[in-house]
Every structure is written in structure tokens, then in C-alpha cells.
């Protein structure tokens, strides 16, 4: 029984550390949709800059070799079995601030 309590405590400690050290960034597709849809959450290290988080979110939600939504680095929550890549006009939510993907980078909304 003591081993079970230790395992449970370790599990809770790991979850707490993850919560304290990571941000969940939301990717919202709206360019070609009739209304904006959150399609993915990506866990990012809190020490990353906003620009680094935006660029990583863009990179991880674009298909280069394998379909991006099958990656274990992305929590895909889209309504379809497949999903297009993130494009100009889509959004990324970092904390409480939304950024629009523009032709050359990002613009705070």
C-alpha cells in the first residue's frame, strides 16, 4: 500500500510541475471556415518567448512529411478526421492574447 501512495504522489507531483512549466497554446483555423474553430492545443515551455511559441505552433500545424494532426506533439481536437495546415488569416492564442497569422509573421489582435 505505501508504494501505491508514493506512485500516486509522484504522479501528482509530475502533473503539478508540468502545469507550472508549460503553457497550452491554442491554434484556431478561420481562413477557409464559416466560423473560427479551435483545432489543436500544443504544450509549450513557459520559458519560450511569444514569438517562439507562435512560430512553433505554425510549424507543428503544417504538413511537411506526415500529416501534422497525427503528431504526438500536438493535441488535435478538430471536428474532422483530417485537417488543413495553418495559413495566413488563422489565429494562435497564447495566454489571453490572440495573434493572427499574416503574410510575414504575426499581428496581435
Describe each region flagged by the PLM:
Residues 2-4, 36, 79:
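Proline-rich intrinsically disordered, low-complexity coils
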Residues 1-11, 108-109:
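Short intrinsically disordered terminal tails
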Residues 82-109:
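Short, compact, well-ordered microdomains
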Residues 6-73:
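N-terminal non-globular leader segments, chiefly Sec-dependent signal peptides
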